[in-house]
Amino acid sequence: MDKKEYIQSKIRDIKDFPKEGIIFKDITPLLMDVKGVEYVIDLLVENLGGQKVDKVVGMESRGFFFGMLLAQRLGAGFVPVRKKGKLPYKTLSQTYDLEYGQDVLEIHQDAIAKGEKVLIHDDILATGGTAEAVVKLVERLGGDIVQLDFLMELHFLNGREKLEGHPVYSIL
């Protein structure tokens, strides 16, 4: 079994969660598996091909799990992007569309310096709305986006279309 197959074997589908008709990708078995976590970080780092990264931006909240470990492995700082009102210092905000309404993401205004090389990470790429909002925040701060990477991608939702012009990598 290769690394990708091993990772896939540690993700379980939960039907009708959080609501009927949704199949939730539960990564908690993967998080509890030391070898699986190591494989995720290995594949994400290998895919970068030695590109310099100054900051890893993790999206709330499941992007924090691997984002922090990825930053450590790359020798980069970690920057959390959170929902409105969750960060204690001065922030920049970005509104994005949800299925029924809108939400707001925030980043500390001093989190990324102009010209810093930034890797954006989350666990899953679905519609691309959240990732697109994070791209806008990073660009407003002057960051240079190296890549967006994800543990998995729901291809049928066409999330990559919102991220055109930026390299996107997904393990699964």
Indicate residue ranges for each PLM-predicted region.
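PRPP-associated nucleotide enzymes
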Residues: M1-L172
